[in-house]
Amino acid sequence: MTSAPPNSILAAATPPATVAALITRLHPVACGHELIRVGSAHDGGYLIPDDLGGIAMCFSPGVSTNADFETDLFRRSGIPSALADGSVDGPPPGAVFHSFEKRFLGSSTNRGFMRLEDWVTRHCPDGLPGDLLLQMDIEGSEYAVLIDTPATVLRRFRIMVIEFHSLEWLFSTFGCMLMSAIFDKLLADFVVCHLHPNNYAPTQRRGTLEIPTVMEFTFLRRDRVRPGDPQPMIPHPLDAPCRPDKPELPLPPCWQPVAPAP
């Protein structure tokens, strides 16, 4: 864990109450579905709700050299995955996939980039039966992509697993304003059902607030939430460090819902 240096960009601080209010809105909730781990035991594995019936396709940008999630997803449920990554020439050896595109996701479609909306529409035109699944780890470009993607397109995804980067920017005025707008957009139609800090990077602390630099968020569309346990399991028994050679990074207390009084 590190503290923000006083002369850094983080010194232009968001009021702590503003950051705390957003973090509270992002607390994971019990979604009424058991969480299962899909993919590898470490990096490339994610916890998602066991609510896969009727999902037609997974979209997985930023696949890099690890398609454990997509391959395991197909073997478990028969859900095919569309892969994309401009940093590699093809999918990893042994990957099970529907298609691969050597492109990055961005806010425009051109030779090296494509919009999420364009990609989804090409493979799954409006009216095609079935929901979709998004597994996105695109090294910070998630913010531009989520701003650009219409809510009508995002609502086509039943489950979204998104790795958010540079979350310490919540401590800065501009960063908090930008991220709040993005999370507000997502929370209108989704709940957070799981959070898992990535132990590749440390946390940043300011007062009682502690923010993991990189964190995996699992979202479930609100219409799929079922009554269930009032509290999510934190940590979850299936959680595992992304880097097995480093200690697990626990979810800081400020990101955890307070258990109701007995």
Where are these regions (language model features)?
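Conserved acidic residues
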Residues: 103-106, 137
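Conserved SAM-binding loop of SAM-dependent methyltransferases across substrates and taxa
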Residues: 64-76
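Short, conserved loop/helix-junction motifs that constitute active-site signature segments
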Residues: 52-53, 73-77, 151-157, 186
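Switch II (G3) loop of P-loop NTPases
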Residues: 134-141
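Short, polar loop motifs at secondary-structure junctions
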Residues: 65-66, 83-91
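Rossmann-like AdoMet/SAM-dependent catalytic core
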Residues: 2-57, 66, 101-102, 112-130, ...
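Active-site regions of enzymes building and remodeling cell-envelope glycoconjugates
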Residues: 79-80, 95-104
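Short loop/helix-cap segments at secondary-structure boundaries that form the rim of catalytic
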Residues: 73-74, 89-98, 152
